[in-house]
Swiss-Prot record:
Pfam families (UniProt xref): PapZ_C, RapZ-like_N
Keywords on record: ATP-binding, GTP-binding, Nucleotide-binding
PANTHER family (alphabetical): RNASE ADAPTER PROTEIN RAPZ
Chain residues that bind GTP: D57, A58, R59, T60
Function: Displays ATPase and GTPase activities.
Protein name, entry field: Nucleotide-binding protein Dgeo_0723
Similarity comment text for this entry: Belongs to the RapZ-like family.
Organism field: Deinococcus geothermalis (strain DSM 11300 / CIP 105573 / AG-3a)
GO molecular function: ATP binding; GTP binding
Amino acids binding ATP: G8, L9, S10, G11, S12, G13, K14, S15
Length: 280
């Protein structure tokens, strides 16, 4: 797994790149002088950390004299060393700074700072394996590009959980779906004590074409919503399916969705209220 040095101009998206790598399982160290890259490698190796990313930029300007030597020493030990450099036009950097009202680390007028920073970081840019111009990129597009350029797999997980509305919806769901319009096995005496995990209960829930059509529309909407979340750079999406008590209908729907949406990494994480025993 790569050891990644993230650098670039202030306002070019380094924080977004670091968050992306952290979400991809990297151990992140921000604002690390080049002289400490080797020590970070040793520490990570001792702790069994396979994915490591550090950032070095204008904030460490007093230590950049050791840049080339530090790079050469680490590259001999890490064949997978990668340097990622981000940049953008001065006009875009200025606009981003005006939006955030942050002070540039070099502390002069912004346009002068940008010019000085480009000169200061030129040796780092020259070492870069990957240079990304973020001028026209959104944060989500930058995240995707970072993963693509580093050839990292972006794992996405669609989490499905069932619940009963009488016990309140979960607070951490991205999407809540109400399936109380489906046929209710609670009113069938022989099905009442059973759960939506059982074929007989699921067969009753999806017993007619209207129920099948309802399910297909739910499935397609969940696919659309989760797909949009993944395209936006998210690594997970949680869908909560609710019926009255959380024992029958919501369980059956969650299980069927998990089987139908495996391409989105779908899995049932919890049947929260299935054992409460109030049915519905």
């Amino acid at each position: 797994m790569p050891f990644v040095v993230v650098s670039g101009l202030s306002g070019s998206g380094k924080s977004t790149a670091l968050r992306t790598l952290e979400d991809a399982g990297f151990f992140i160290t921000d604002n690390l002088p080049p002289e400490l890259w080797g020590a970070m490698h040793d520490l990570a190796t001792a702790r069994g950390l396979e994915r490591v990313a550090v950032s070095t930029d204008a904030r460490t300007r007093f230590f950049l004299g050791a840049l080339e030597d530090s790079y050469l020493r680490l590259s001999r030990r890490r064949e997978d060393l990668r340097v990622l450099f981000l940049e953008a036009t001065s006009e875009v950097l200025l606009r981003r700074y005006n939006l955030t009202r942050r002070e540039h680390p070099l502390g002069e007028t912004l346009l002068v700072d940008f010019a000085r920073e480009r000169e200061l970081l030129a040796p780092l840019r020259a070492l870069a394996d990957i240079v990304i111009d973020t001028t026209d990129l959104t944060a989500a597009e930058l995240s995707q590009k970072v993963l693509q350029m580093l050839r990292l797999e972006q794992d996405f997980h669609l989490r499905l959980l069932s619940f009963g509305f009488k016990h309140a919806p979960p607070r951490d769901a991205d999407l809540v779906i109400d399936v109380r319009s489906l046929p209710n096995p609670y009113y069938v005496p022989e099905l009442r004590p059973r759960t939506g995990l059982e074929p007989a209960v699921a067969g009753y829930v999806f017993r007619d074409e209207a129920s099948e059509q309802f399910y297909r529309e739910v499935r397609d909407f969940v696919r659309l919503a989760a797909g949009r979340a993944r395209a936006a750079g998210r690594h997970g999406y949680t869908v909560a399916i609710g019926c009255t008590g959380g024992q029958h209908r919501s369980v059956a729907v969650a299980e069927r969705l998990a089987a139908d949406l495996t391409d989105l990494g779908a899995q049932v994480t919890d049947h929260r209220d299935m054992q409460v025993g109030e049915g519905g």
